[in-house]
Amino acid sequence: MAEISPADVKKLREKTGAGMMECKNALVSSDGDFDKAEKLLKEKGLAALEKRAGRATNNGKVFIKMKGDNSAAVLVELNAETDFVARNPEFIALGEAIAANALEKDLNAPNDELNGLVQDLATKIRENMGLKRLCQVKASSNEYLTQYIHGDGNIGVVVKCESDKPEIFKNEEVKSFVFSLALHIAAFNPIAIDRDKIDQAWLKEQEGIFRVQMEQDEKLKGKQEKVLEGILKGKVTKYLSEICLLEQGYVKDEKITVAKALEECGKKTGAKLTVTGYVYYRVGAE
């Protein structure tokens, strides 16, 4: 039997939100296999399904730098050990400089030069720091980018929209609407734009978890298979509506979906408006 360390239990608890003893028991039952233990907790209903990014365990900030013509944007996550350092003016200046450097040099990932800048400041401040991730989002001539930083920089979003009449992106009302989409994504962190973008193998696994939970539900004992399949289908449909951007209730009016809000905005301008991509960064998330 594999030895279960307190660090393993802590890591599983941070990932799933389940209790310490439940996590330890799951690791023991799975002989130390982290993925199996996580799945076991889900099947027992002790861990939330993956609707949101992992719980943040690091301090730091998300930085975004965008070109003046909104044709490209860079997102950066810079981490530190403490919130005190994450609020340090030198730390903030470094994050902004990294984002600007990456945008200027057309980078899409950290490199030795940027990591060296981080280590220089870490040595000066005497606290461990790290450039966790960096990416660039680009827009075509018929697309438009906007950004949103939440709070003190713990969440950052860049959203990309497309239109058959790209001149509408000069319209202030449309710009405001696209910004509200970025705000929505920051608030609800959808896993995908729509159902077609969901990985089917991953969805099959979630369906399997629902099946196990239903088998353990005393209220469903003795139900006909046809009835159970209907319940399962309903659970999957509800789950998809919670994790797919276009099916979520729009942040400014939850009576309508994001898809409907896009349609209504398009009608006002006489153009078709679609979301073609987005990037969501949360400090400490995997």
Question: Which residues does each PLM region occupy?
Answer:
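N-terminal assembly/interaction segments in proteins that build large macromolecular machines
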Residues: A2-E286
